[in-house]
């Protein structure tokens, strides 16, 4: 209970910019931090005292009066709580838990009906950018270079073409284009709002000439319904012209993953590879499971599985997509080979699928 409540206070720190203010402007009293962030001193004092009591912040003189105490972020906590460009940044998790909790009554009803709850709105927290730092710092600087032949092709001539399916707000596509200056990347996602954000991000990064984004359903050209942004939305297109197709942490969130893999296969040139990165889970069900497995199952119960249950043809995969499950989807899609790659990617496992 203490940990759950503490995460709610982290939500407040992230939402109100309290960590950022301490990081950017240094130690502060409760009145100073309230002034910096446009908040109320008494609320801020309670938040600061809680954070110091729990060790998330430090205080220069605990014996000083309540209004005289100055609080600061310990250096080791800055990457986790304040530096959004660091791969260790985790303060966004507070917002994710708050959003998920808001959905729980509808999820409970979906458990009874067997359908899907209404889509969970991003407001008021806004769309989280939890993968931004990870993708920009690791995807194309460490993970893809660990796949030697893929890395070589992306660096070579003629310039490679890459399709990034389920690209979200575009950070995976942008990361690849930044690391490999010869390539062009076409990102596809069924979320039109995410695509609009991705285009903005690419423009801000100066990559609009090599990175394009299209709202399209990765499940194929005739897709419509819950997985599509609108009836009859076209699929990713450009069949047979891509040297590399990627699906980074998105396949388990698709209601029809085999259809998405089939569309990806059609997009590949010869020779070409589909790289799938998805959750690093155990090969078989175990109980009790590791903390990491418990984490993936929890998100599957409250978010990943409910999101796809509205499609009558859903595969109902959930976040715990084991290698055997992906192998079955791959063979259904017409792939002949699936290889688990030796890429050290933390909580992700990398697969290569070829014709």
Where are these regions (language model features)?
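A short glycine-rich, Lys/Arg-flanked "PGG" loop and its adjoining helix->strand segment in the class I
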Residues: 258-270
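Conserved Class I S-adenosyl-L-methionine-dependent methyltransferase catalytic core
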Residues: 2-13, 21, 50-158
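C-terminal alpha-helical "lid/dimerization" subdomain adjacent to the S-adenosyl-L-methionine
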Residues: 277-332, 339
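Short amphipathic alpha-helical interaction segments
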Residues: 39-50
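A short acidic, leucine-rich amphipathic alpha-helix
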Residues: 30-36
């Amino acid at each position: 209970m203490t940990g759950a409540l503490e995460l709610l206070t982290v939500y407040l720190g992230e939402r109100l910019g309290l960590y950022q203010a301490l990081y950017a402007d240094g130690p502060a009293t409760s009145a100073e931090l309230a002034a910096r962030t446009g908040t109320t001193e008494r609320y801020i004092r309670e938040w600061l005292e809680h954070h110091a009591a729990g060790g998330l912040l430090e205080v220069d003189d605990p014996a000083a009066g309540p209004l005289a105490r100055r609080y600061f972020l310990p250096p080791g906590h800055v990457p986790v709580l304040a530096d959004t460009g660091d791969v260790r940044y985790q303060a966004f998790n507070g917002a994710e838990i708050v959003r998920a909790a808001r959905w729980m009554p509808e999820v409970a009803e979906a458990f009874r009906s067997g359908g899907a709850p209404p889509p969970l709105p991003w407001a008021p927290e806004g769309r989280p950018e939890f993968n931004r730092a990870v993708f920009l710092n690791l995807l194309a600087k460490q993970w893809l270079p660990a796949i030697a032949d893929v890395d070589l092709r992306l660096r070579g001539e003629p310039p490679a073409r890459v399709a990034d399916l389920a690209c979200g707000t575009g950070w995976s596509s942008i990361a690849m284009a930044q690391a490999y200056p010869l390539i062009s990347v076409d990102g596809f996602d069924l979320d039109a709002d995410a695509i609009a954000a991705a285009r903005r991000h690419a423009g801000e990064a100066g990559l609009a000439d090599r990175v394009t984004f299209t709202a399209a359903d990765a499940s194929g050209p005739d897709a419509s319904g819950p997985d599509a942004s609108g009836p009859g939305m076209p699929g990713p297109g450009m069949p047979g012209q891509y040297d590399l197709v990627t699906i980074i942490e998105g396949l388990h969130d698709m209601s029809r993953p085999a259809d998405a893999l089939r569309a990806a296969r059609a997009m590949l040139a010869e020779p070409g590879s589909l790289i799938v990165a998805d959750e690093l889970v155990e090969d078989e069900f175990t109980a009790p499971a590791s903390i990491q497995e418990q984490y993936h199952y929890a998100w599957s119960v409250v978010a990943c599985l409910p999101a796809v249950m509205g499609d009558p043809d859903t595969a109902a995969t959930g976040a715990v997509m084991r290698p055997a499950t992906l192998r079955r989807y791959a063979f259904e899609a017409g792939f002949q080979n699936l290889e688990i790659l030796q890429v050290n990617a933390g909580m992700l496992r990398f697969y290569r699928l070829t014709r």
